[in-house]
């Protein structure tokens, strides 16, 4: 089954390019550490998901590119074409000559309705090229204008027109120090609208990815391209094919459906995060060897201590003791910074993958009490290595990992709203104070729900 990717705004288009490039490079990598037959099956499965029929031997990304300024889209198209290996379809883009000026309301209330028909027609054409549709993967920023405002509008339209298809939004959480003065407003409006129309939100925090670039990849002057390549690696490690069941030699057909089934058991809980291990520069990799036991021990501690990378993990954090009453557990977790999960999916790729022991992730103490551990944890595997790593693990988690950043953004936006700061920028384009209040109410409920796990 195929996934149609919708790239929105500068952020969505730049990341989208890196994602397709990473997927293509990995599936055509000669060092897959598996038989030729297995490699061909992996390649065919990846291609069916993300690329359509080839023109003259070049794969075409199953994607629609949307931006209100032409510059980034033109750069993205040309970079893909220059690779000589894959490209975007000739008529898969929509762009205009004016941006949204970091104004969420302008993206949502002006650009959205004005260009709705053109954008939805492009998406429909892409859907018609798929033999069967797994769903939509929408890449966007949370705090800008076009990506976030128009992104929320397009997602809502996808929900209206393709209500039986899954929608997953990959959103970029802004830097804590802030790139845009109204980013907290934009973020609150984006999240609340997506919570109503998307099936899952896959969140990457800019601050966390920046740290990975600095500490693990040893990059001295970090560019957006560096950050986007780390993001693309993480997304590829989740979306590339894995076997359907233990011992099977058939790859999963429905990537989005399988992810949702494993990770989103209730519509109140839609926030997903990714952790990867190992992540390192080519130079460091030359001198490194890994065991599954070592990788999984670190990955489990990254999960429970809410660490985004293996450097600087807090090893003092432990799961609460069984038998503790819920209230005691909640306050103790806050004290210990223990990250309670609803559901976890571990994806293992590489050598001796079937020897990996995942018992540590099946511990009931890691999970909320209302879901059986057998339903809360899943594992996907393939012997086919990913990217440059002989062994690698990805963890997709629905947990309390975003509680603090979400609470902070809602708090900052509320303080600005209480003093009516910048509200006129939104009301003049039809986003009223009532809309803000609805958004605050919804997100405060999300915070409370995750808090009480």
From Swiss-Prot:
Pfam families named in the record: Tubulin
Gene Ontology molecular-function annotations: GTP binding; structural constituent of cytoskeleton
Gene Ontology terms: cellular component: centriole; cilium; cytoplasm; cytosol; microtubule; nucleoplasm
Entries under InterPro entries matching the protein: Delta_tubulin, Tub_FtsZ_C, Tubulin, Tubulin/FtsZ_GTPase_sf, Tubulin_CS, Tubulin_FtsZ_GTPase
GO BP terms, alphabetized: cell projection organization; microtubule cytoskeleton organization; mitotic cell cycle; positive regulation of smoothened signaling pathway
Stretches that traverse the bilayer: none
Keywords: Cell projection, Cilium biogenesis/degradation, Cytoplasm, Cytoskeleton, Developmental protein, GTP-binding, Microtubule, Nucleotide-binding, Nucleus
Compartments in which it is found: Nucleus; Cytoplasm; Cytoplasm, Cytoskeleton, Microtubule organizing center, Centrosome, Centriole; Cell projection, Cilium
Residue numbers binding GTP: 143-149
Keyword tRNA processing on entry: no
Assembly with partners or alone: Found in a complex with TEDC1, TEDC2, TUBE1 and TUBD1.
Family listed: Belongs to the tubulin family.
PANTHER family: TUBULIN
Function: Acts as a positive regulator of hedgehog signaling and regulates ciliary function.
Protein's name in the database: Tubulin delta chain
Species per Swiss-Prot/TrEMBL record: Canis lupus familiaris (Dog)
Gene: TUBD1
């Amino acid at each position: 089954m195929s996934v149609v990717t919708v790239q929105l705004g500068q952020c969505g288009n730049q990341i989208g390019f890196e994602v397709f490039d990473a997927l293509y490079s990995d599936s055509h990598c000669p060092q897959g550490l598996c038989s030729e037959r297995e490699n061909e099956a992996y390649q065919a499965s990846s291609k069916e998901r993300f690329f359509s029929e080839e023109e003259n031997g070049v794969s075409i990304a199953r994607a629609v590119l949307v931006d209100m300024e032409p510059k980034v889209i033109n750069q993205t198209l040309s970079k893909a074409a220059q690779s000589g290996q894959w490209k975007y379809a000739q008529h898969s883009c929509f762009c205009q000559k004016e941006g949204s000026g970091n104004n969420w309301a302008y993206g949502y209330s002006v650009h959205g309705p004005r260009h709705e028909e053109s954008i939805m027609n492009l998406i429909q054409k892409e859907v018609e090229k798929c033999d069967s549709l797994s769903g939509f993967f929408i890449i966007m920023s949370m705090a800008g204008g076009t990506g976030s405002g128009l992104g929320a509008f397009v997602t809502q339209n996808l929900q209206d027109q393709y209500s039986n298809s899954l929608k997953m939004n990959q959103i970029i959480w802004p830097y804590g120090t802030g790139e845009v003065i109204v980013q907290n407003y934009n973020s609150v409006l984006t999240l609340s609208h997506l919570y109503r129309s998307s099936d899952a939100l896959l969140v990457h925090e800019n601050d966390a990815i920046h740290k990975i670039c600095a500490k693990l990849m040893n990059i001295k002057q970090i560019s957006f391209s560096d950050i986007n390549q780390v993001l693309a690696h993480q997304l590829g490690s989740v979306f590339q094919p894995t076997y359907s069941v233990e011992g099977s030699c058939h790859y999963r057909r429905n990537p989005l459906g399988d992810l949702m089934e494993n990770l989103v058991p209730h519509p109140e809980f839609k926030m997903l995060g990714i952790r990867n291990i190992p992540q390192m520069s080519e130079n460091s990799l030359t001198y490194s060897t890994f065991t599954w036991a070592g990788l999984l021990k670190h990955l489990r501690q990254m999960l429970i201590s809410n660490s985004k990378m293996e450097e600087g993990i807090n090893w003092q954090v432990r799961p609460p003791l069984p038998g503790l009453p819920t209230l005691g557990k909640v306050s103790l977790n806050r004290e210990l910074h223990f990250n309670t999960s609803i559901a976890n999916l571990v994806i293992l790729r590489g050598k001796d993958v079937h020897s990996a022991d995942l018992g540590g992730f099946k511990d009931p103490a890691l999970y909320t009490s209302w879901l059986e551990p057998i339903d809360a944890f899943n594992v996907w595997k393939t012997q086919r290595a990913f990217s440059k790593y002989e062994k690698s693990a990805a963890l997709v988690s629905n947990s309390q990992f975003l509680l603090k950043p979400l609470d902070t953004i809602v708090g900052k936006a509320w303080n600005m709203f209480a003093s009516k700061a910048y509200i006129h920028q939104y009301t003049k384009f039809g986003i009223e104070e009532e809309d803000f209040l609805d958004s605050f109410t919804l997100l405060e409920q999300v915070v409370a729900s995750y808090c009480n796990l």
